Amino acid sequence: MRKEIRWGDGPDHVADLHLPKEEGPFTNEHGTPAVMLLHGGFWKQAFDRSLMTPIAEALAEAGLIVWNVEYRRWRPDDEGVWQETISDVLRAWGHLEGLDGVDASRTAVIGHSAGGHLALVVAALSERRPKVCVAQAAVSDLVAADAAALSDGGDAVRRWVGSPVEGQATPWNALNPIGMTPQCPVMLAHAEEDEDVPIAMSRACAEAYTARGSTADLVPLPGDHYTIIDPTHEGWRSIQEGVLGWLMSGKSVG
């Protein structure tokens, strides 16, 4: 079952709540585990949460509560919206624990591409830490992504931030996951044939987190940038299995 919920006053302060049809093996006296989903699209207004609907449905069918959220994104006439984006994502994460039936001690965040970047920000900055963070094909190094001109126009990162990295290091460093310390275990899932965001970015991020003492697993998968959000593909099935295993046992993310 899916229903749209407004969690704020703005037009983008909306989310789709997917509920399992019946109580599954993960529900106990404390409630049901829940997952917040963050879509990608290089923080552009042209892309929305419908990108994550297929995996939202798959996770709900498996027995989880799924919170597929929208957030403010940049438009050609309204750039430099990073503060709004980060505020929205952290607020949406805080809203999750108050939803009916959610076991707040077993919540996870999953994001794809630019949403993977945001998921890593949640893992590092949120007051209530996730049980696990799954960053799929994450733009985990903003400086490297800008240098490589990732995205169709090659300038999506600096348009979202609102400035070039040259001479503006402070906001870039403050927003860059590779320099953060996640407060929960992280799965960096990445397709080996990804041409939109190279797997080398997740590999470098996993190494940086591990060097700082965080739990971070790089999970290379078959396929491309989009197969890992396709519930019929083996790449996504591997991710889902890992998430369900973690929420059930807490022993492994990879």
Region spans (language model):
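Glycine-rich nucleophile elbow surrounding the catalytic serine of serine-hydrolase chemistry
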Residues: 111-121
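Conserved alpha/beta-hydrolase "acid-adjacent" motif
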Residues: 195-204
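C-terminal catalytic histidine-bearing segment of alpha/beta-hydrolase fold enzymes
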Residues: 79, 203, 210-254
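Short, surface-exposed "cap/lid" segments of acyl-processing enzymes
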Residues: 23-30, 35-58
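Catalytic nucleophile-loop/oxyanion-hole region of alpha/beta-hydrolase
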Residues: 46-56, 67-105
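N-terminal cap/lid segment of alpha/beta-hydrolase-fold proteins
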Residues: 1-27
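Hydrolase active-site cap/lid region
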Residues: 121-167
